[in-house]
Amino acid sequence: MAGLYFHIPFCKRVCAYCDFYKSVDLRRMDPLLESMHRELDARREYLGGEPVRTRYFGGGTPSLCAPEAVAGLLDHAATLFDCTAAEETTLEANPDDLTPAYLAVLRRAGVNRLSVGIQSFDDACLKLMNRRHNAAQAVEAVRSAQREGYENITVDLIFGVPGFGNDTLRRSLDSALALGVQHISAYHLTVEPGTAFGRRAARGQFAPVDEATSETEYALVHETLTGAGFEHYEVSNFALPGFRARHNAAYWHGVKYLGIGPAAHSFDGRERHWNVASVTEYIGGTPAEAETLTDRDRFNEYVMTRLRTAEGIDLREAERLFGKERAARVLRDAEPWLKSRTLVLAAGRMA
């Protein structure tokens, strides 16, 4: 099974924390979509005939894309790849884009999972992060989606925001749970160079929270969500049983995926490819760059990605894929963390 990823890089407003590639020039939407269709045709052999299990629209803000255009990309992909077994089609959205009319057309297009970028249910926190929506709009967006029949909704939350402690975080977690969503991704705020927060930090006007605060807030997220029946199945991801993110699992488990659009990444099992991070250059046809992974690269990625998940490393699988020597080395290198109980070894798995 394989995955398809479509990158829609446009945003109406740049969030204060975001260091992803994005563009605010929405006039380029139509030329970009035409180029994405051309890239689909050009890379029709990339997945080697593997059936597509998941499809994902990320950004940027994919909900700025007309639902008819989303349908066009999905329909085109279905003529090139075997999408008959596709189980999950996700679109990332800002709350203020999710009108009933938009949601209805999107659902008919085949989108069956929404990822709503709420980040916080506190208006002051949202304003600090330069988000477009407010808390009331976030609540209404999820409720509108539920009324339109969406039964698989995930929301993003951010914790570790300076000036907003446990009480604010607890209220946001409680608000998300009260909405009855099936999945919650909780990310710690990182202050990156080149972002609004990064520039303020460089001027001494913004300071990240300390490590003790980070640990306390992460523990609060874990305890609150697992206490509500969610599985903490990956570092930042929590799901009710049966609602884990299938597309993201492709990245953590070495599954093939094809990325379409500027700055999109792809993996065919041996090589990683990435498109130029520029709408202008992408439309102009700048070719993707590639890196062939050595066995050592693949092994290191295997260890790092598996340790992000609750299942961890299956040592028998590691031995089968990379040989006894490398599997044994994992155990040797992990010994200090096993002794401190930071890692646990049980039934042939280390997590």
What is the meaning of each model-derived region?
Residues 1-8:
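Immediate flanking context of iron-sulfur cluster ligation sites
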Residues 9-20:
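Local cysteine-cluster metal-coordination motifs and their immediate loop/turn environment
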Residues 11, 182, 256, 348-349:
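Beta-strand-connecting loop/turn residues
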Residues 238, 347-350:
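Short, Lys/Arg-rich nucleic-acid/phosphate-binding segment
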Residues 321, 350-351:
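Generic amphipathic alpha-helical segments used as scaffolds and interaction surfaces in large
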Residues 324-339:
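Short amphipathic alpha-helical interaction segments
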Residues 338-348:
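A short, conserved structural fragment
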